[in-house]
Amino acid sequence: MDIFNPDHDLCLANGSASFVPPATARQFGQDCSAIMEYVLPDVSPHKVWGWDRIVLGRLLKSGADPSQLPSEAYLDTVRELSHRRYALSCREYVFSKIGNPGFLCDIAPYEAMTMDSIISTVNEYADALLKAPWSGSGKGIRKVRPDSWTASDRGWCAKMLDRQGSVMVERRQKVALDFSLQFRMTADRLLFEGFAIFETQGCAYNANLLASNGHILGLLSAYSETKDILRVRDLVGEYLETAFLGRYRGVLGVDMFFSEEGLLAPCIEINVRNNMGMVSRLVYDRLASEYTGGFCTGASGASGASGASGAGASVCAGTSGRSGAGLSAGFPDGQLKMRVLNASSPEQLRSSLAGARTILAGGGPDALHAVAIF
């Protein structure tokens, strides 16, 4: 049994095994369940988007063998590792290892434990982002300035302090390009699976570029020297091996960005679950394999990989007829995007899908969500 549970981040933030995710999130999971075709198994033969107590309960109720499911202790570890302080720690590790970090963007993330420390840090940064310790996909984020505090902002901070124990505060930067590093943790080592470039709308995920690792690295190298990008990648891999090896198995997506000044901001967020960046890698690799005579990109597509960031296994399984529909021979490198669409009605969704090359998931007669290639 495979489960696409895009409400995973909400379940972690709530922390209760009895939490009921919003109906919109549940419908997204139902509409786009076919996206699990592009997800790799991890600690269980049952593939899930992200492990939490809610999805464990769903599997047990469906009759899954408990011996083939992760323990509650493991799920507690996943929740711990998903806290934003691990991204903060990863950033500190990268900065400490690079002698002259002139190419890095310092967003100076700080974990504030009191309202006074939140306010003083926002006053220091002048333009800041407030983030809930457990949140993702654009949720749990607020933009604030010292002169624009509202009662709603203060109430939100008080709620986060009460429910999650802290609030993450960081300098707000103007972003030129969002990207991520995609890793996969096995029982005994970390594999670097590739790069992903993504787009957001209002802090929420919107789309991924479908491109080879070589093409993406070329785009990233327009902002910073290739050797510096690969150095950061290797240091992030070192940190993940130290903090996650033996504690977690599965996909790890580390979000980063280049600022408008061309500086690299590492370790903005660590997604301790599957994510659309890894899906875009597998989608591109699979379609490129089918449409270019067997050539398959993968971790080795990024030159200079070594150690923890060495070559991982490329995924070149055959695509279904649906996935390949409408795509001509010679899959284009860096010219198409994988996009998530949300609509208020099935008719609106069908209209939005009119220009799609192919639909990877969703888009049924009553669906409000879809993942498609444009």
Question: What annotation goes with each model-predicted range?
Answer:
Residues 162-166, 204-262, 326-354:
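A long amphipathic alpha-helix within ATP-dependent nucleotide-binding catalytic cores
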Residues 105-108, 122-143, 160-175, 254, ...:
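ATP-grasp fold ATP-binding core
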Residues 12, 25-120, 136:
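Conserved N-proximal alpha/beta basic substrate-recognition cap immediately N-terminal to
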Residues 106-109, 128-154, 179-180, 202-221:
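Glycine-rich phosphate-binding loop of ATP-grasp-fold ATP-dependent ligases
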Residues 126, 151-207, 257-266:
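Phosphate-binding site of ATP-dependent enzymes
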